[in-house]
Amino acid sequence: MLEREMMNLLDVCYDKALQGVLPGEKSIEELAEDYLAKTSSREKAIDKLIGYQTVLCGTNGFITGLGGLLVLPVTIPTNVAGVIYVQLRMIAAIAHINGYDIYSDQVRTIAYACLTGSSAANILKNMGIKISEKMAVNALKRVPGAILIKINQQVGFRLVTKFGQKGLVNVIKMMPLVGGVVGGVFDTGMTLTIGNIAKKVFSE
């Protein structure tokens, strides 16, 4: 998969994630408000959201079927698209819960950076954005377009590498019994990490 294809995949998944692709699936705003209504604080709502989305990413049949609903080039594996879709819904919902504009280019780009997992801190730091500090909503709005382009370039490279490693996991998935367990652990582990990073980046 090329970096250009990866960025196209991210754009498709993010746009679809905001409104949902499954019948009856809630928009990000509705999803976020639903979690807020069922918990006593924003932090608890986010933790519950992360937990549920992490479980979804470990369900291989659901993820593969979900990826098939997205209109994508044949070179994009449906399970990869499905995982990214679920993870972006989680990240966008976290951002919305804490008051960020999920339709802005800035939030979209930072959401993409979160998908790189532990690499997100270095990518953002290189662009002058410190993940260890609370990113005020107004401060994020001031991140210039040129910086967003550079972040996207680094994100594309990291994600192509990341899902290349996932390809090795997919080979293992073909092994009876062991495959499903290994693949599920890989997806759930990454989703949990990504969720916690998004929680830190898109803080109140």
Question: What do the predicted segments below correspond to?
Answer:
Residues 66-72:
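Short coil/loop "hinge" linkers that interrupt or connect long alpha-helical coiled-coils or helical hairpins
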